[in-house]
Regions:
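C-terminal catalytic domain of Rieske-type non-heme iron oxygenases
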Residues: 1-191
Length: 191
């Protein structure tokens, strides 16, 4: 939200297959101005905060898709992400009972010219392992992990959008897709 990628009013959805196994989060970056009411609802929004390098946010339309951000959950520890003009894989590798390492792989394409390569590298500094947004995601995962350690029976219900049990949602302000994925995962693990 801080940089206008995922804001109220963006066209967004969380899409899952019937089993919950496959899920995609998608959002279309809007060029519209965010309303003052929407700004009040965004905890991460900082009035007047700008990037010194505005090209971080340049989105070059590379193919016919309405989405500027897609995140595909392959398994609880593997996500394929396309954010703006970056393509990457995030893999969580358990490193002990209460520890993990986040591994990132960012991609370029053989047909990229030098300017597009620079652009992808630049955006990788926003979305990638040491990027402004990547660090925030890693911290969020740490909070979840720390929270789960305090749950006595090791079961936890994610409550964002509790009225929608599990599956597809037309908003990013929902965790119904992640609930569907974990229902599938628990079946696969025999839990």
């Amino acid at each position: 939200m801080t940089f206008g990628l995922l804001v109220a009013g963006n066209r967004s959805l969380m899409l899952t297959d019937a089993s919950g196994r496959h899920g995609v989060m998608a959002s279309a970056k809007s060029e519209a101005e965010v309303s003052s009411d929407a700004k009040k609802e965004m905890r991460a929004y900082k009035e007047g905060m700008t990037l010194r390098e505005p090209r971080f946010m340049d989105f070059i339309q590379e193919f016919d898709s309405p989405w500027s951000v897609t995140m595909s959950t392959i398994w609880p520890n593997l996500i394929v992400q396309r954010e703006m003009n970056t393509l990457g894989i995030r893999q969580i590798v358990p490193n002990g009972p209460h520890e993990f390492v986040m591994k990132w792989t960012m991609f370029g394409f053989e047909g990229d010219d030098a300017e597009m390569t620079r652009h992808r590298l630049r955006q990788g500094n926003l979305m990638g392992p040491a990027g402004f947004l990547g660090l925030e995601d890693n911290e969020a995962m740490k909070f979840v992990q720390d929270g789960m350690r305090r749950v006595p029976d090791k079961r936890h219900l994610v409550k964002l959008d509790p009225a929608h049990e599990a599956g597809t949602s037309d908003t990013l302000i929902s965790e119904s897709a992640i609930r569907a994925m974990y229902k599938h995962w628990r079946r696969e693990m025999g839990l």
